[in-house]
Structures are given as structure tokens and as C-alpha cells.
């Protein structure tokens, strides 16, 4: 049984009070808005405008006596709020010690919270159709007072697909296959919520529960083929621009993703989906001193499933990957000099994750809850090197990120209001810990 802290009780009370204020109203599903259609051509738009208040209370990135923390850090740079609470001194007979706390409050808008997509469709024949989409996200519009100097736009997607009776050929910058099976599970609870903001004082708006079980697939240039669906089954494969990281050079081979999925509606209220995914990519680095070329293979497997019955939705998944972090393939994280996906010797670390969500929707109200965990296995190179009995070049690698959350939302036509709470815990291999509570309220307009 989980015992809530005083902070957790205050946040839960705030969310319960806010949730009661949402007004009962009919809801509809959003759809593309077609504003031009003629002679087999159509132009449509889709988008999202959102603003979320988020309060983060808990621990800042912890100190370490093992050189540096790798992975899991949430601050850029470190932000604390003085002496937050007194704790028992580990040295017997000594007075209590002060433990700094984190208190951050932001109104977030931009990035995931502000999107505009424009697409063009063309019917070449009755059985051959082309679809396309260019989706633009604003890097950040939270403030003009230096919370984020960069005000650029991010062309997140730019793809076209050719649908034929023999299958679909899709090309351009698009969501990658491996890890994308997390999305249907995450959306059960975080369709309109923020969750973990990735970095609490950085302007990005939403990581949801990614990093503690679910993966973020990411976007890159691809050539993808999808077979026709038969008895609910479909196979997809894609070759993609390879990922590179600090001190790694691009390889002569593209990354390969593949998926076998099952999607079947047994009635108007009963639908089942299953996703089995894999990824393979060679990575390489040339030692500038010895000119030695070192190669490795990023290899991962992923599986998830979602079942919808009437207003209920339940889903879960798991994965393991060599050369992945807790959030994505070949993850670097906040510290580019200490990436999570590989160590100082450029050996690839292995990570794994598990996650699940359940929710119920009635009259446009959705109440959902879930939990997840991700784990990182250190390499032999992560062991401390002792010099005079003191760790000299050692690191403390992230051991685990775990979380549980509750979200509540109300859809009113094209508007969606949300309230949420999340408890996030990081633990590193030498015992460093971090617990953070996230709470938020949001408003979304989507089309």
C-alpha cells in the first residue's frame, strides 16, 4: 500500500477540487478540417493549441560522490529552493542535515502544446490515393522574458503516402516504428495531460510517462512499406536515416525498423490491438588517436497491447534494447558528455521497460491511472576506478525510473480540459535517489 506524503495529499486535494469544476457537456471526436476539395484534390488542416499550469514539488537532482550522475536528471541547470526539510544525519550523534527541495511552477505552451498541420490528398484512381502532411510545432511560446531564447519552429513531420490495393508506400520525415506501440497505451491517460515534462525548468511541455516504461519513438526520414491488412494482421518495415551520437559517426547502413501488428474491431464497442516491433542499427566510432574503428549494434524488441470494451480501455507493454536509454533509441539525455545509451568506452548499455494504463470514459469524462518502470544495466566500464581509495573517474548510472499517475479529463466539443497528478522516482546505481510530484491543470483546443 502506498502512503501519500503531505505534499502528495495537497496535490491530490487540488486536483480533486479542480476536477469537480469541469462542466458536463456533450463531446465529439476531433477530425481533420477539409477547407478545399475539387477534382480529386483536397486540402485539410489539423492542429492543437494548449496551455497547462504545472507544479513540480520534490527533490532536485541529487549530489553524488561517484563522479557524475548519468541519466535521469531533470534540471537544466540545477535549481533548488534552499533548505526544504531536515533529515536524520547518517553520522550518529550529529545534528540533522538540510536537504534541498525543488519547487517550480510554470504555465507551459508551445512545442507539443502548439501544433499546426496542413495536408493534401489526391485521388489518382478509385483504388490509388495519395495523402500527405506537413506538421509544424513551435519550439516555445511560453514567455518572451528569456525562459527560452529560441523561438524557432520545428517541422516535426513532412511525409506522403501512396495507398494501393497492394499496400501503402510512405516516404518522408515521420514517426519511427520502434517504440511507437507505446503511444496507444500512453494516450489512455495522457491524451490531454502533460505528465513528466522531461526537464522541469525547460520549455518542452510533455513527456507524459515516457522514460519510466514507455518509449518515445521520435521522427526521422524514412522509406516505409505497409502490407494490406488481412484478418486483422499487418506487417510494416522501414529503412531510416541512422541515428548518431556524441563522438559517433554516421554509418554506411540505414537503420531498419519492423512491426507486426493486429487491429480488429469485433463490434462497435470492442476493439483489440497488438504491436510487436524491432529495431536494428549499426553504430561506429573511429578513435582519433589510434585510428581504430569500433562498431556496435543497436538491437531492440518491443511489444504492447490495448483493448477497448465499451467505455473501458486497458493496455500495457514492455521492451528491451541494447543501445537505448530509458526514453528512446541511442539516448543522450541532458548531459551530452555522459550519454545514457553508451559509456565512456563507447560500449552500449542495455535498458528495459514495462508500463500499463487503464481508463474509463463516460459522457466525455475520462478517469485513468497507470504506472511504469524502466531499468538500465551498467557496463563493465561503469565500475568505479579507485585511486588512493577514492573514486576518481567513476560514474553512477541511472538504475531505474518508476512512476504512477492519475489523470482526469473532460472533452467538450473541440475543447478538452485536464487535471493530473504524477509521482516520479529516480534511483541511481550507487544509491542516489530523487522523488518528484507533478500536478497540473490544462486547456486544449484541437481540430
Predicted ranges, named:
Residues 38-40, 107-113, 150-155, 214-218, ...:
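Transmembrane beta-barrel outer-membrane domains
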Residues 36-92, 192, 274-276:
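Transmembrane beta-strand segments of Gram-negative outer membrane beta-barrel proteins
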